[in-house]
Amino acid sequence: MKHKSLLQIKNLHVKLANTEEYILNGINLNVNQGEIHAIMGPNGSGKSTLSKVIAGHSLYKVVKGEIIFQDQNLLNYTIEDRANLGIFLAFQYPLEIAGVNNIDFLRLAYNSKLKFNQRNPVDPLKFLEIVYPKLKLVGLDESFLYRKVNEGFSGGEKKKNEILQMSLLDAKLAILDETDSGLDIDALQDISNAIKSILKMSQFKQSIIIITHYQRILNYIQPDYIHVMYKGKIIKTGDASLANQLESQGYEWLASE
């Protein structure tokens, strides 16, 4: 069965806004519906920059190339509209939002997407019916909804909150930027199981890009493709076995090829 193309990145060159410093130097990447891609590489290779550029972060300027998502040129869309189109970015360090309950934050995001799609917003009672099954899916209890956004959360709770948002917003493309960072083995297993449950619920139609330094999350969520970035370029693409090679040999052997 041939899968439909979801994301196409063509010859993407990016620099920091208001500077001449290039960070991405000709990225090409194709992600089909239902695929899992992992992007690995040393610090400073451009992995996180790529995720933020896809999401529409204003810190970066696209100088050349295209980002096509569901046949739409993302460069014509704001960061908010990209999210409403179905792109979700989970941050390595989720932000705390003082004074805002998690449930209010989540309902605001959910209703924003409904409005973008010209649908009526849901009231608080209806939203509870929607969010409860999602809580169970990621292993959180109801009290979690009434805590302030990420305030006093453990590392695992912050990451679970991100995965809860991913499920609630029914993301077509989820970009997980070092979601495994700072997690112990139990928390990593919990997060991985939650992600796999979400994929199963979507009938494996959601696509995921996992950005990571380490192989361990890929032991739980097996990617279809692994891409290695170095100095702003994808220099090698392979299957899941490439992660094992990188774990044992590092990146220098690729840089010298």
From Swiss-Prot:
Q: Name one GO molecular function term.
A: ATP binding
**Source organism, top-level taxon:** Eukaryota
Which residues does the annotation say bind ATP? 41-48
Q: Which PROSITE patterns does this chain map to? A: ABC_TRANSPORTER_1 (PS00211), ABC_TRANSPORTER_2 (PS50893)
Q: What GO CC annotations are associated with the protein?
A: chloroplast
Question: Which Pfam families does this one have?
Answer: ABC_tran
* Domain ABC transporter as annotated: residue spans: 7-256
Keywords in UniProt for this one? ATP-binding, Chloroplast, Nucleotide-binding, Plastid, Transport
Q: Where in the cell is it found?
A: Plastid, Chloroplast
Q: Which family does it belong to?
A: Belongs to the ABC transporter superfamily. Ycf16 family.
Do you know which NCBIfam families this protein is assigned to? Answer: sufC
Stated name of the protein: Probable ATP-dependent transporter ycf16
Q: Which organism is it from?
A: Galdieria sulphuraria
- Origin organism lineage: Eukaryota, Rhodophyta, Bangiophyceae, Galdieriales, Galdieriaceae
